[in-house]
From Swiss-Prot:
Species annotation: Bacillus cereus (strain ATCC 10987 / NRS 248)
PROSITE patterns reported for this sequence: AA_TRNA_LIGASE_I
UniProt xrefs under SUPFAM superfamilies: Anticodon-binding domain of a subclass of class I aminoacyl-tRNA synthetases (SSF47323), Nucleotidylyl transferase (SSF52374), ValRS/IleRS/LeuRS editing domain (SSF50677)
Binding site for Zn(2+): C888, C891, C908, C911
Taxonomy of the source species: Bacteria, Bacillati, Bacillota, Bacilli, Bacillales
Motif 'HIGH' region, residue numbers: 57-67
Protein known as: Isoleucine--tRNA ligase 1
Reaction(s) the record says it catalyses: tRNA(Ile) + L-isoleucine + ATP = L-isoleucyl-tRNA(Ile) + AMP + diphosphate
């Protein structure tokens, strides 16, 4: 008889190799055929809603690792919520207006100047839709479950109409105004920018100290002094109209040779050192407030520079006397306005100096620095020129420096509802907690929001102008424009004349002849995405406002979190979200930012093509995503190893349940052995721990808990000793069915627990599980932890056994290395434990030699009675010897009962009995 044919070896068609790059697309096709998103929504209908609102990625180019991290994190949460008593719809969105799309078309050779704005915008829309399609397929490949057929797209007419309504509501409340103010201006984009469109990079700039002679000392100064200012933007000097000093600071008149200079007293030493003054002495001090209304002369133009008081003046750098150009700085503008100065801005849209800067007209602002500095030297006003590298604002799209420039723009007055914004921030739950401080400080300190852009591709600002120049924004005009946009899209604004965009028969006192013109600026794209709470959450039947959660990268505190909060509080008085969760950026394995120049860019597509989407998802679950995270081939190799461990665990469980029918073979908990019940206690601990981790969005804790359970609790212990029973005993042996009962519970629970993270693998495992009826594991709920009677005592006892078992394993390892035994089944062990451990061992009814995977087990005396040469460990001394007897051909246990049964001479007594009872006809 071939005894190997009498072994119940694992049997399953579940493949050992994942082959995910091929298998996942097939699984996704299956999901599409069964309409998995709709099925889950149907299955969870009527449950409380949990709405995670998708911050729209920008529709341009392939998805990158930041997109993958973001979408997968969202998918974890939505999938988990739909398995824990919620209906969790997930509507993906795209942000589709803005400069990058205009640039992409120009780069493709579109001749923009040869077509109308409306024609150009049509091309922009076509391009945006192509990009949406491209990204949609890539997000689906990640295994993200969403309403992919019904996303929200910011260029769609229904969305634009709601955005117009948001603008109209804000205007009605008096929050929208037009004003000339210095704004961030990008000469390369030829448009105003919002704070969220700015990034800081190092820039080399001239650093100059300039003397402004006093013209009128107002009886405080003698008239022969000179104010010293410091600036890193010499090109703004043609726009200088004043000097700001701090009212509370003390200023010193410093005599240096024949000159007298005015600087802040506390900066005397620093300035003296920088300007290399020798024998400088302070001849007089005055308070800043006394210098108000004294007048200096512009160094190279025949005009005055008024001395004014400003709280923005500091002594962190410079001289305490601040060059003030109301057309080129926010503080300058505020102070200048207070003192009635004009807003002089001699720089055009392209960043070129105009005729209002005589002598420098036609020069690009950055190129004007040198001739202006030379002019200062020529007139004897330049005291020092050096160069510094400092952090300077750049256009986040073109990566070129920007300037402050006063222009006529549309603003949303944050000041008008700042208090409500701060209250809304305080009422929101922030994860990580520092998010609250970050947004609170931004809201507290931010100026009014410049919402107009001088571009073509965006939502028009729905304002008309009367013949006398009055802007027209009324309920009637707003509603009419919203209706037009809903019907025709926003391109209608560029296709029709102003009068054809107004309600029929519309009149206005400022237009006696019935003539009107329309605004040509468009809205900031942050106003687009920031209106999604109205256009999506409020408008769609399957969603609700406020959303339960917004989840984006930490750059969105100044972006989408901020703009959404501003528009929602302005319109509804409340935040659009109950909670906000943020994640860090994806860096390479060495912690460097990914860039083309370094050549360290990791793309999601490559990972999915080589390893699979579930490996990428498992990586997302493994990282501390609330900080910046790292990815590299080595890191992915480690993650793939963990995946293999989890997959092999599933395969082992399935293989050993091939002949198990849950309805017939399940053993009641009360009839299980202690070790089996202990395994169920460990499973319940896992369920509790994993669900708590999902609840707190701690996916790394889920990853580690599942990995440890598969490796330590199952592979290294339970499954290891269970093989002897599963393979060797007869199919219906009570111990075998007991173990299968536990394995079945473990398999079902484990499959569900990994579903949010590894949906492809979980749904691949699911149909192989005996007795399941659901079409997909996604249509089930998370397992519930069952409280077993006496669980705590059981856990205490068997945890103690596990620590003692570790001592035994160490001793067996030593014996193997010393060639006392080959493998552990060759061993006979005698234990000399501590009193506590001895009592514990004596209370165990299970076969201890099976639990230790040895052929013979003896309990000797106490630890102190152990032979002197026996290795001693924390809980026991262990004597390892070669077991006596021969090796059984069937179970490989060394036994003295081999051959006792004449019909089965090579088998031990146990195997002979099993064979006779189960396999001999």
């Amino acid at each position: 008889m071939e005894y190997k044919n009498t072994l119940l070896m694992p049997k399953t068609e579940f493949p050992m190799r994942g082959n995910l790059p091929k298998r996942e697309p097939a699984m996704q096709e299956k999901w599409a055929e069964m309409n998995i998103y709709e099925k889950v929504q149907e299955h969870t209908k009527g449950r409380p809603l949990f709405v995670l609102h998708d911050g729209p990625p920008y529709a341009n180019g392939d998805i990158h690792m930041g997109h993958a991290l973001n979408k997968v994190l969202k998918d974890f949460i939505v999938r988990y919520k739909s398995m824990t008593g919620f209906c969790a719809p997930y509507v993906p969105g795209w942000d589709t207006h803005g400069l990058p799309i205009e640039q992409a078309l120009t780069n493709k050779g579109v001749k923009r100047k040869e077509m109308t704005v409306a024609e150009f915008r049509k091309l922009c829309a076509e391009y945006a839709y192509e990009q949406v399609e491209r990204q949609r397929e890539q997000f689906k490949r990640l295994g993200v479950r969403a309403d992919w057929d019904n996303p929200y797209i910011t260029l769609e007419p229904a969305y634009e109409a709601q955005q117009i309504k948001v603008f109209g509501d804000m205007a009605k409340k008096g929050y929208i105004y037009k004003g000339q103010k210095p704004v961030y201006w990008s000469p390369t984009s030829e448009s105003a920018l919002a704070e969220a469109e700015i990034e800081y990079q190092d820039k080399k700039s001239a650093s100059i100290y300039v003397a402004f002679p006093v013209k009128d000392g107002k009886n405080v100064l003698e008239g022969d002094e000179k104010y010293i200012i410091w600036t890193t933007t010499p090109w703004t000097l043609p726009a200088n109209l004043g000097i700001s000093v701090h009212p509370e600071l003390e200023y010193a008149i410093v005599k240096v040779n024949d000159e007298k200079y005015i600087i802040a007293s506390e900066l005397f030493e620093t300035v003296a050192k920088t300007l290399e003054w020798e024998n400088a002495e302070v001849v007089k001090t005055v308070k800043g407030s006394e210098l108000e209304y004294t007048v200096a002369k512009h160094p190279f133009y025949d005009r005055d520079s008024l001395v004014m008081l400003g709280d923005h003046v500091t002594t962190d750098a410079g001289t305490g006397c601040v060059h003030t150009a109301p057309g080129h700085g926010e503080d300058d503008f505020i102070v200048g306005k207070k003192y009635g100065l004009e807003v002089l801005c001699p720089v055009d849209d392209k960043g070129v100096l105009t005729e209002e800067a005589p002598g420098f007209e036609g020069l690009f602002y950055d190129k004007a620095n040198k001739p202006i500095t030379e002019k200062l030297e020529e007139v004897g006003a330049l005291l020092k020129l050096t160069f510094i590298t400092h952090s300077y604002p750049h256009d986040w799209r073109t990566k070129k420096p920007i300037i402050f420039r006063a222009t006529a723009q549309w603003f949303a007055s944050i000041e008008a509802f700042r208090k409500e914004l701060l209250e809304a921030v305080a009422e929101t739950k922030w994860v990580p907690a520092w998010g609250e401080t970050r947004l609170h400080n931004m809201v507290r300190d931010r100026g009014d929001w410049c919402i107009s852009r001088q571009r073509a591709w965006g939502v028009p600002i729905p304002v008309f102008y009367a013949e006398n120049g009055d802007p027209i924004i009324t309920d009637e005009t707003i509603n009419h424009v919203a209706d037009l946009f809903r019907e025709h899209g926003s391109n209608v604004w560029f296709e029709r004349e102003a009068k054809d965009l107004l309600p029929e028969g519309f009149t206005h006192p400022g237009s006696p002849n019935g003539e009107f013109r329309k605004e040509t600026d468009i809205m900031d794209v942050w106003f687009d995405s920031g209106s999604s709470h109205q256009a999506v959450l409020e408008e769609r039947d399957d969603l609700q406002r406020p959303a339960d959660l917004y989840l984006e990268g930490s750059d969105q505190y100044r972006g989408w979190f901020n703009s959404s909060l501003s528009t929602a509080v302005a319109v509804t008085g409340k935040a659009p979200y109950k909670g906000v969760l943020s994640h860090g950026f994806v860096l390479d394995g060495e912690g460097r930012k990914m860039s083309k120049s370094i050549g360290n860019i990791v793309v999601p597509k490559k990972i999915m093509d080589q390893l699979g989407g579930d490996i990428l998802r498992l990586w997302v679950s493994s990282v501390d995503y609330q900080s910046d995270v790292r990815i590299s081939d080595d890191i992915l190799k480690q993650v793939a190893e963990v995946y293999r461990k989890i997959r092999n665990t599933f395969r082992f469980l399935l293989g050993n349940l091939d002949d198990f029918k849950p309805s017939e073979n399940t053993v009641a908990v009360a009839e299980l052995r202690e070790v089996d019940r202990y395994m169920l206690v460990k499973l319940n601990d896992l369920i509790t721990k994993v669900k708590e981790a999902y609840e707190t969005y701690d996916f790394a804790a889920v990853y580690h808990a599942i990995h440890n359970f598969c490796t330590i609790d199952l592979s290294s212990f339970y499954l290891d000793f269970a093989k002897d029973i599963l393979y060797i005993e007869g199919a219906n042996h009570e111990d075998r069915r007991a173990i299968q009962t536990v394995l079945y519970d473990v398999l079902v629970a484990l499959t569900k627990l990994v579903t949010p993270i590894l949906p492809h693998t979980a749904d691949e495992v699911w149909p192989y599980i005996p007795g399941v009826t659901e079409e997909s594991v996604q249509l089930t709920d998370m397992p519930e932890a069952v409280q077993l009677d006496g669980a705590e005592a059981l856990k205490t006892k068997w945890d103690a056994f596990m620590t003692l078992r570790d001592d035994v394993l160490k001793a067996l390892e030593v014996a193997r290395n010393e060639k006392v035994i080959g493998k552990s089944l060759n061993a006979s062990i005698t234990l000399y434990p501590t009193a506590e451990m001895k009592a514990m061992l004596e209370s165990i009814n299970e076969d201890l030699k099976q639990l230790f995977i040895v052929s013979e087990y003896k309990l000797g005396g106490m630890m102190e009675e152990a032979p002197a040469d026996a290795p001693k460990y924390e809980h026991t001394a262990v004597v390892v010897a070669q077991a006596t007897g021969e090796t059984c051909e069937r179970c490989w246990v060394v036994s003295e009962t081999i051959g006792k049964d004449a019909e089965h001479e090579t088998l031990c007594e146990r195997c002979a009995t099993v064979v006779k009872e189960n396999y001999v006809k």
